Amino acid sequence: VSVDCSEYPKPACTMEYRPVCGSDNITYGNKCNFCNAVVKSNGTLTLSHFGKC
């Protein structure tokens, strides 16, 4: 399972709630929040699955 984060980071994310679960076992509210965290982690954070952790 993967997410294309090539257009991130973005300065602001919408409040849209479409949860994704990161490899850090944290539920991110949407792809934007998740991708910003991926960029911040220098690519060490990956997608575990779609939906809550």
Curated annotation (Swiss-Prot):
Residues with site note (Reactive bond 3): M15, E16
Residue ranges annotated for the Kazal-like domain, each copy included: 3-53
Residues listed as glycosylation sites in the UniProt record: N42
GO-annotated molecular function: serine-type endopeptidase inhibitor activity
Annotated Gene Ontology cellular component terms: extracellular region
Subcellular location as annotated: Secreted
CDD domains assigned: KAZAL_FS
InterPro entries found in the cross-reference section: Bifunctional_prot_inhibitor, Kazal_dom, Kazal_dom_sf, Prot_inh_Kazal-m
Statement: the UniProt record of this protein carries the keyword Nucleus: no
Keywords, in A-Z order: Disulfide bond, Glycoprotein, Protease inhibitor, Repeat, Secreted, Serine protease inhibitor
Keyword Secreted: yes
Record-annotated disulphide pairs: C5-C35, C13-C32, C21-C53
Written domain comment of the UniProt record: Avian ovomucoid consists of three homologous, tandem Kazal family inhibitory domains.
PANTHER family: OVOMUCOID-LIKE-RELATED, SERINE PEPTIDASE INHIBITOR, KAZAL TYPE 2, TANDEM DUPLICATE 1-RELATED
Name assigned to this protein: Ovomucoid
